Structure formats: structure tokens, C-alpha cells
């Protein structure tokens, strides 16, 4: 697996959960002997929703909600077979979306 890299993108609503997951990935990759670049924080996506709280009158009465999607990027440069096996066995939290690409 020479001259390859593994790019891991993580998404989560809870920033503590995503930081914990990236720390586990980085620690596992370093223990397996790979060179790691990251975690790189990507821009957080903020979605805002405005809801009318009055069913009939009082148009100015509204509630606003927001949900934030936190993202991180981890690059593993020149991974070995041991690194890939260790990452495959890694069990991450349920609230984290993981996308892996080889390049």
C-alpha cells in the first residue's frame, strides 16, 4: 500500500463525541505505525429553523432552533496492512458518521 493515503471524514452533531472519535482514530493509527495528518476541523454547518408558536394571532411570537453539524478530517499517509486492520476493528460511537476514501 505504498504511495496511498486514507482520508477519513467524520460528521456529528455533538462536538465532544466527534473529538473523542478522532482521538481514537489518531491513536490507533499511530500505534499501528502510520503517519497521521490531522485532525483538521472543517467548517461547522449551522441550520436554523423558525417556528410560529401561536396558532392564530401574534405573528411575531416565534421560536428559533438551530442544529450544528461538526466535521473533522484525518489523513493517514502511507498506511500499512496493520494500520488498515486496526482501523477496521475500531468501534466508534453511534452518533458519528464516518466516510473513508482511498486515494
UniProtKB/Swiss-Prot annotation:
GO molecular function list: structural constituent of ribosome; tRNA binding
Entry keywords, A to Z: Ribonucleoprotein, Ribosomal protein
InterPro entries, per database record: Ribosomal_uS10, Ribosomal_uS10_CS, Ribosomal_uS10_dom, Ribosomal_uS10_dom_sf
One Pfam family, short name: Ribosomal_S10
Entry keyword annotation includes Heme: no
Job description of the protein: Involved in the binding of tRNA to the ribosomes.
Subunit structure: Part of the 30S ribosomal subunit.
Entry protein name: Small ribosomal subunit protein uS10
Annotated source species: Haemophilus ducreyi (strain 35000HP / ATCC 700724)
